[in-house]
């Protein structure tokens, strides 16, 4: 008898928790999304820093994989990509499906979550909303940065390290992460 994965995980969690002798009650609720978060085609302002960091992470991961496959080391011995290669890699990065990202509520604040966005200890149980408008918003955000900075500048920043790439895309006086967004937004 084969059980579907969610049911298998539920039984596994119950078996683990039940084996400790004490009954532990866990509960989680999905974040409540406002109309902008549900329906707007753009990335909501309070999630732009997380989106930028996700884009920087994905660009770095894809460029690192491409360099590992490259067979042309530069003068320092590391793999340097040709302009056409890194341009193609960055374009494919932005065109990916972004399905591993979604919105989660952490400490009563909505955050974009996914690879490269972990900040401290994860809650013991949580619900993340994926799919919907989030993959398209992340793709549009990625292409926005390609247009704003260009592939050459992005690749040069990547070659100097992840922190430099993230600072280029997300930092600066007008960058998405330049100021802390208040946890509670005023309703109009």
Swiss-Prot record:
Keyword Calcium listed: no
UniProt motif (Prevents secretion from ER) ranges: 185-188
Location(s), subcellular: Endoplasmic reticulum lumen; Secreted
Post-translational modification as stated in the protein's UniProt record: Forms an interchain disulfide bond with IgM monomers.
Coiled-coil blocks: none
Top-rank taxon: Eukaryota
Any GO BP: regulation of B cell proliferation
Description of how the protein assembles with itself and partners: Part of the ER chaperone complex, a multi-protein complex in the endoplasmic reticulum containing a large number of molecular chaperones which associates with unassembled incompletely folded immunoglobulin heavy chains. Interacts with HSP90B1 and PDIA3 in a calcium-dependent manner.
Name of the protein in question: Marginal zone B- and B1-cell-specific protein
Function: Associates with immunoglobulin M (IgM) heavy and light chains and promotes IgM assembly and secretion. May exert its effect by acting as a molecular chaperone or as an oxidoreductase as it displays a low level of oxidoreductase activity. Helps to diversify peripheral B-cell functions by regulating Ca(2+) stores, antibody secretion, and integrin activation.
Cystine pairings recorded for this chain: 49-177, 52-170, 94-142
Recorded family membership: Belongs to the MZB1 family.
Signal sequence bounds: 1-21
GO CC list: endoplasmic reticulum chaperone complex; endoplasmic reticulum lumen; extracellular region
Entry keyword set: Disulfide bond, Endoplasmic reticulum, Secreted, Signal
């Amino acid at each position: 008898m084969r059980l579907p994965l969610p049911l298998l995980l539920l039984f596994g969690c119950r078996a683990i928790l039940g084996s400790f002798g004490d009954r532990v009650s866990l509960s989680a609720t999905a974040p409540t999304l406002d109309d902008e978060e549900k329906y707007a085609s753009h990335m909501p302002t309070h999630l732009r820093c997380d989106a930028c960091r996700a884009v920087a992470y994905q660009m770095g991961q894809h460029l690192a994989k491409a360099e590992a496959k490259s067979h042309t080391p530069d003068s320092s011995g590391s793999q340097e990509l040709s302009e056409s290669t890194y341009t193609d890699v960055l374009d494919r990065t932005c065109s990916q499906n972004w399905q591993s990202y979604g919105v989660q509520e952490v400490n009563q604040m909505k955050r974009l979550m996914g690879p490269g966005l972990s900040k401290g200890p994860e809650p013991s149980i949580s619900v993340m909303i994926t799919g919907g408008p989030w993959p398209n918003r992340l793709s549009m955000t990625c292409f926005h940065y390609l247009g704003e900075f260009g592939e050459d500048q992005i690749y040069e920043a990547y070659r100097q390290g992840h922190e430099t790439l993230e600072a280029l895309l997300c930092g600066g006086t007008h960058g998405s992460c330049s100021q802390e967004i208040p946890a509670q937004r005023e309703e109009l």
